[in-house]
Amino acid sequence: MGNQFSSGADVVDGAASKDWPSAVYDTAVYPVGTRRVQQADEVNAANSTHYGDREWIFVYNDEASTAFAEGNVIMLDNSDYQPFHGLLSTATIHRHRMLGVAGGALAAGKYGWIIAKGVCEVQCDGGVNQGDRIVSAASG
């Protein structure tokens, strides 16, 4: 599959880097939609309650002035449907419009990584029990 790679080491793009998940860019230094796998040992080292591989996806924050915050559900921008241009989820959406969950802050009009698959915290407006179905909603 094109535009996908595993971090697998502390060297990213020829430079020492452990902070790539939180990096914010002014330009598309990777093609939007690029996927990156963070190995299970790196995921667990960053948060001991997390396990398994985590897949990140490179996106553009298409919000006019609102930054993504850790745990925000990010959906495809439905005003122009530009591939991998994200907005904060403000309604119940079809799963194919959901891009992922913000793993950290990503300023409006900037590029960065969000979590597409794997264990992470998700902002919600109520309790969640094991086996509960999680959906995006207008509040939360």
Please identify what each model-predicted range represents.
Residues 2-140:
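Extracellular receptor-binding modules and their adjoining Ser/Thr/Gly/Asp/Asn-rich linkers
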